[in-house]
Curated annotation (Swiss-Prot):
It holds the Pfam family Ribosomal_S8e. One of its GO terms (biological process) is translation. PANTHER family: 40S RIBOSOMAL PROTEIN S8. It comes from Pyrococcus abyssi (strain GE5 / Orsay). The keyword Magnesium does not apply. Gene3D superfamilies: 2.40.10.310. InterPro entries: Ribosomal_eS8, Ribosomal_eS8_CS, Ribosomal_protein_eS8_arc, Ribosomal_Se8/biogenesis_NSA2. This is Small ribosomal subunit protein eS8. GO terms for molecular function: structural constituent of ribosome.
Length: 127
């Protein structure tokens, strides 16, 4: 079923609000992509408002990890250690912005939005 992101059709009292127009396609939302740790990257290109395109990362194997000096490396993601968005996400290996991931070179904090950007960027955490 579609996710509609328009105003509620009910008043606080429970009465109905009669809209002056129909629902618009641009007001539809989508289910979250829930980017998971996998053996290889998997991307999905979707059409957005205005005919633009958005790249969704549905499965991630690699992350671009940057250290304090700004030098970056493409490294393999091992697992999700912690996710402040939802503690169940760490158990399910779902990557979101702010998640702490374990990589080949150490722990890193995700700075990009994989479901919106189509890539996992992270900064290396000091041990």
């Amino acid at each position: 079923m579609a996710i509609w992101q328009g105003r509620s059709l009910r008043k606080p009292s429970g009465g109905r609000i009669v809209l002056a127009r129909k629902k618009r396609k641009r007001e539809l939302g989508r289910e979250p992509s829930n980017t998971r740790v996998a053996e290889q990257d998997k991307r999905k290109i979707i059409r957005t408002y205005g005919g633009n395109k958005k790249v969704r990362l549905t499965a991630a194997a690699y992350a671009n990890v940057f250290d304090k000096s700004g030098k970056g490396r493409k490294v393999r993601i091992i697992r999700v250690i912690e996710n402040p968005a939802n503690r169940q996400f760490a158990r399910r290996n779902i990557i979101t912005k702010g998640a702490i991931i374990e990589t080949e070179i150490g722990k890193a904090k995700v700075t990009s939005r994989p479901g919106q950007d189509g890539v996992v960027n992270a900064i290396l955490l000091e041990e």
